[in-house]
Amino acid sequence: MGGGLLQLVAYGAQDAYITGNPHITFWKVLYKRHTNFAMEAFRVNFTGSPQYGQRVVAIINRNADLMYKTYLEVQLPDTQTVDVKWTSAWERRLGYQLLKKIEVEIGGQIIDTHYGEWLFLWENLTSNFDNSVKLDTMLGGYLGGTETTAVSCGGRPAILYIPLQFWFCRNPGLALPLIALQYHEVRINVTLSPATDLVTAATPGSTTVSAAAALLPQIKDMALYIDYIYLDVDERRRFAQQSHEYLIDQLQFGLQQTLTTANARIDLTLNHPVKELVWVFQDARKTDCGSTLTLNAGFTQPFSYDDIVNRARLQINGQDRFDERYGDYFWKVQPYQHHTGGAFFPMRSQVTAPAALTVLAGSCSVTGDVLTVGADPASGTAPQQLIVEGATVSTTSPGTFAPGTIIQSFGTGSGKQGTYQLSEPSLLTGTTTGLSVIFTLPNLNYTPHENPINVYSFALQPEEHQPSGTCNFSRIDTTTLVFDSIFTAGIAKPTKSTPFNFRMYAVNYNIFRVMSGMGGLAYSN
């Protein structure tokens, strides 16, 4: 008898708890059939043109039956003005920094409000490292150059894709039933950050932030792209005729306060059953473009936070909710215990190539419509762009190419040497003087970077829709966060001369009801 058969017949009373009266088998695939549906993305425009610091509104069209995943698509200016640079937004998360706040309004009632900073915090807590790297490219994580150089879009506009995180965007079972909201209009209200929050002077001190912001070109285009869901006839009829009740997540912006003392008691104003609290401390100089803070290096860091807490505790109605804990417990242990992401944000750093720029007159040449790339061991990879570098290049057509003009982008290739076809050879006179080839740089490094985002969760799994624990702050009179600061190398304590900002967010449950063609919240603040 084989060993496998011995295992099979070694069956006792204890096995009855594991394999007795089985419900599943691993050796036959089972699946469930789903209702018929189709999904299509539609563009929804905002009323008026988007301007920095202004509020714009998008009225959601009833293109289909349900409203699901929603993205804000922003087309940035394709030109830059001298001495005007985009803010770094902590590894250039420009898409989040652009949003001051964004609201869902149904029937004239604000159902939920999110903030650019909250989207950043939520990404850190819920996205794994690989997804954060992908989001980096969607949110303007690398528009060209470094934080202190101008955005270079290669002659075309840079486009930001900002995923929204409202309740109906994250769970298909919570998709917004437009078919059942016949008498209530659905709107998405977006308030953009002022230009002074988005730029800094290229050379600190040479141009004031206000002057730099005044020179910043306006956003070229902005729109929502929404995944609409078409339901089949029977399910569509049920959605239209029946009442609906959804358990949804809401965000509360609990408090924003400036700290000027090392020890503090912060009173929080919260409502509803809350499943987790999220808060941050930040040196106020990090959002002040005019600051002389050394680590600013001439640009702002709105999403860079500080670890200043020695010990902290939460008090509810004057009673300690838990024993006093060290400050790093809230941004190390709590995210590890309750979140799939973490406060270790992927920091992008560019590897410097030994010879990223190779002059054509040296190892490359243009003959007719062919670019020939010669041997250059230092460059290491295929050419990325043919550009004008350092001199004006004449063309066969009227006009000239100024320095910085991109003649052609090649993308990625299989090797550094060889010939490359030029798409517009007639534009060149045959001269090689002043032309350069930009070689693809080595892969950009992504390394974890500690970014202290503090969490306290009342739920076992706060990322899940299924409730797993809450604290009903509507039934609590006072809530206070008590802490004392500790000096950390390179980080000052809160004082009047070096104030710190404190911001608290809370995620709570509420009930969203849809009946008789109208929708609204069951519980208000």
State where each predicted segment sits.
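Small/polar beta-strand repeat architecture
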Residues: 353-389, 394-442
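Short, low-complexity Pro/Thr/Gly
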Residues: 1-356, 440-525
